[in-house]
Amino acid sequence: MADRNRRSVGEGVTAGLIAGVMFAMMEIVSAVLMGNPALMPVRMFASVVLGMGAMEGPLGTALVVGTIAHLALSAVFGIIYGLFNARLSETTKTSFGRQAGVGILFGLAVWFVNFQVIARVLYPWFLKTPQILQAMMHGLFFGLPLALIYAASERRIHAPAPAARTA
């Protein structure tokens, strides 16, 4: 049990960081397509730590703080996903299709908690972003890659050993 949790935490951190980078890249692309500055998402990430001042403060500070905050949260969400998945059946853990569904739902749950619960109290400027777009981005560009990376990792672990060759 402890070994399974330890492995799930490790897989979760790795998958969370990779999915977090993918999500950040898509947030940047989305910002540009909507006519906003490319690094506006990084400023938003930084505002979790620095408050509203990150939106107009020095860009260098926002880049460093925003990147660290975003990756730290991505790793934490990855750990939560990994620990949740540790309780699922091997069939579900290794199925790309099932994991895709679970991952998208997880991404939507992350969006809901972050935007509809926490942001309403602590970060009201987050609510100025298009919420449907944010929900889709969290599901498709964080939750989905997180789940598929996790499933690929589980498939490697649970793959049958190759048959021994006879001479």
Predicted stretch roles:
Residues 34-59:
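Membrane-interface interhelical connector segments
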Residues 76-79, 138-151:
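Hydrophobic cores of alpha-helical transmembrane segments in multi-pass inner/ER membrane proteins
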Residues 83, 111-124:
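Transmembrane alpha-helical segments of integral membrane proteins
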Residues 63-85:
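Hydrophobic alpha-helical transmembrane segments
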Residues 2-35:
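N-terminal signal-anchor transmembrane alpha helix
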Residues 124-137:
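Non-cytosolic membrane-interface motifs at loop->transmembrane helix junctions
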